[in-house]
Amino acid sequence: MKVYLLQDLPGTGKKGQIVDVAEGYARNYLFKNNLAILADEKLIEQVKKREEREQRKEEERYQKALDLKKELEGKAVVVKAPGGETGKLYGAVTTRQIAHALKEQLKLEVDSKDINMPDPIKSVGVYDVDIHLFKDVWATVKVKVEKE
């Protein structure tokens, strides 16, 4: 029996999915507890259309991320931080500072959680920083750290 799930059910499916379940399970548990409704042809068609729309949106976001990656590759941002005469900084450059520099200099809104630095930046120099744009799309941007 095909049912439309109204909630996530471990082992059965996620909310909004149409799944095939045993008739007894559907009637005695899913329907009685308002966890699912019977999936008729009209509902199945609506779910298919919704999934196709979501797939198209996903592909568009992926393509935008690829375009943005091409645009960002090779670009650099400058971050100024207080430091000593030897080139060592008094603190470390944070992902939040890099996100702010990206916003100010390249007009790119990036969440600081999407910026990946292998090690903290604690001295003046040029560093490669990875930015997570979409699922498996990463862009590398150069960050030039200068002393204030």
Swiss-Prot record:
Tell me the GO BP annotations in alphabetical order. translation
Can you provide one Gene Ontology molecular function annotated for this UniProt record? structural constituent of ribosome
| InterPro entries registered for this protein in UniProt | Ribosomal_bL9, Ribosomal_bL9/RNase_H1_N, Ribosomal_bL9_bac/chp, Ribosomal_bL9_C, Ribosomal_bL9_C_sf, Ribosomal_bL9_N, Ribosomal_bL9_N_sf
Query: GO cellular-component terms in the record?
Result: ribonucleoprotein complex; ribosome
Keyword annotations from UniProtKB, A to Z? Ribonucleoprotein, Ribosomal protein, RNA-binding, rRNA-binding
As for what it does, the entry says: Binds to the 23S rRNA.
Q: Which family does it belong to?
A: Belongs to the bacterial ribosomal protein bL9 family.
Q: Which NCBIfam families match?
A: L9
* Protein name per Swiss-Prot or TrEMBL: Large ribosomal subunit protein bL9
The protein's organism comes out as: Coprothermobacter proteolyticus (strain ATCC 35245 / DSM 5265 / OCM 4 / BT)
